[in-house]
């Protein structure tokens, strides 16, 4: 049906705005000849995989410490606009391919993945607006009705916080709830209980980049112990109602073939054994980036040891890239992929990567970045693809909560058609 609709792009504009860390990012607007308008903002990561698409910055020390994005804005106006003006907004694949071809590099270094993605998403939003459809319905069609289970990052460490916790994210997973709305409430109640538990221990209750608490703790295990206590204090059962997940972000503390955590160096085999011991001790059902992004051999060891029991998610390992995902599939590594739009740099490529994962039985976890905006595209993307899981931070900071609130509205809009992912087997991939 959509291939028979033609509405040309009339104008495209871009500007430099600020993200949640006070750093510049790019916003794009796409106006169609029908008058429909789409607006999109691009996030930015703190711990980034080496193989991500290129985020173009100005490198001008006189502005924003070199982090400005005026080059990307200029590329939209001078290089992307001449290519896309007049193209059919409903031909998303051709629009994205035209920008990729104009860029001409393997990682979008010429135009910048941030410039390309901003226009890509704004085009999709304009097309949805032209039809009077919400973005999730435009992208996903009539079967887009699964609300994701949220992976709530309530204790921040690593590159997301100025503390001594090695692992980057400790998350709660309300898998036992009956609806997204109920799961969100459970998460908020556990988050409140966690704040009280930290306060009673005279630990800091300031928050990190993603809205989770960022206390100094004696060990990574202490973070898990406090989470178990907080789940119980909120009135829920650890595991069956609220499970745990971790983003280890192991590439961030990998040095010369060793993993440096809890104050000492450990071999890859010791790292695998340590993660396995945590799974034995705690109700952990998902581990992301448990090893370095290029430690393929030991990723295989980790997968053989835990892959039939819990969800093993590749983020830095796969960077939303179909080539790296295919390598993981071929090697039997991990069983899930984290999906970040700006890692690959266009909507079309993101959807292709999700489709590849689905064909091979890998789950997709739709994710934010540590530097976010009020843009809620990922909430719609999670529902559009029936991904079943979303990572968008804690229960504080409005750029995080905006995505949760968008999902609440989608669930309400869907009414009786709305399905909470764990109820139909579309939550985390685990067999324990």
From Swiss-Prot:
Pathway: Carbohydrate degradation; glycolysis; pyruvate from D-glyceraldehyde 3-phosphate: step 4/5. The active site is at residues 210, 340. GO terms for molecular function: magnesium ion binding; phosphopyruvate hydratase activity. Binds a second Mg(2+) ion via substrate during catalysis. It is an enzyme of class 4 (lyase). Catalyzes the reversible conversion of 2-phosphoglycerate (2-PG) into phosphoenolpyruvate (PEP). It is essential for the degradation of carbohydrates via glycolysis. This is Enolase. The lineage of its organism: Bacteria, Bacillati, Cyanobacteriota, Cyanophyceae, Oscillatoriophycideae.
